[in-house]
Amino acid sequence: MGYGGGGSGGGGSGGGSGGGSAGGVIGGVGGTGAAVGRTKKFLGSRGIMSGGATPNRNTIDFWNIPVLSSALDFGDLSIGRQHMSSCSSGIRLITFGGNNPPDASRIDFNTFLTLGDATDFGEMTGERSSGTNRVGSAPDGNRGVFMGGTSPTTGLSNIDYITIGTTGNAIEFSKMTANRDGQAGCSDGVRGLTAGGNPPQNHVELVNISNLSDAVDWGEIPVAQIFSGDAGTSDGSRGVFVGGYGGGTDNRDNVQYVTIGTLGQSADYGELFNGNYGATNSSDGTRMCTAGGSEPTGYATTIQYHQISQGGTALDFGEITQARGMAGHDSGG
């Protein structure tokens, strides 16, 4: 099905139930904040936005997150597509899946500090698109995780992983608690969270990235959303989810946060310029940049930003090279 007001909505449907036991996934998670003593390798000063809709784009943009500016051309994806999901080791950007159509199983990679076209990395365990299935890519600097998605219209509970520094095919990691698509993800380097989903929901699941065990319930975000594109990011402790779709023509302007290391701690703490479904998000650990997306007047070229520690109303950062949404997006370098 299609959804999303403004520009054209993304496709995909899911829901239903899946499997998954706790299996010790929480590990060291408690009420004491983020992972301690770890370098947040997956954060960096260069934001990269890949592909998007509509039509299917192969464009890759980049910008310097600490400096207000417009994006520049970085290169091209292997094929134009939308509804992908990205993750980062800080050195290498990975782009999973997407919809051309049909759904794709391909995985591309770029090196953050080397301008150029994407290179083939390998294949996912099956053809899946993200965006309408924004699956949580949750990197610890070495392992990238892809959760849920649709193929082609059925929500999945699969969790795939890759070793970011080594090209090759993805391996099935474990299962989510239910079949889900339309989520957004974030990580503190140890724990990965995936929030929201289709139909609009506020459920949040947790996976320990280093353990091959099933996801467990984390809690809820305040506002039920379908997310699309890489709408989640973090500063290594606080995870942030932007915009989303609530049904009908209801594109949301909410900015919501979670404290990744504290089960159930979340709040609605800011706003985007407009209701926006399909915006993408990245962070350098201090500043969060939100790019593109579908707004009431159509697809946007805007890059907006927040200081993650403060929230509030978004401020103007610059422009991307093409109006689009439902893209891949992360930071490194």
Features from the language model and the residues they span:
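Polar, enzyme-active/binding microenvironments
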Residues: M1-G333
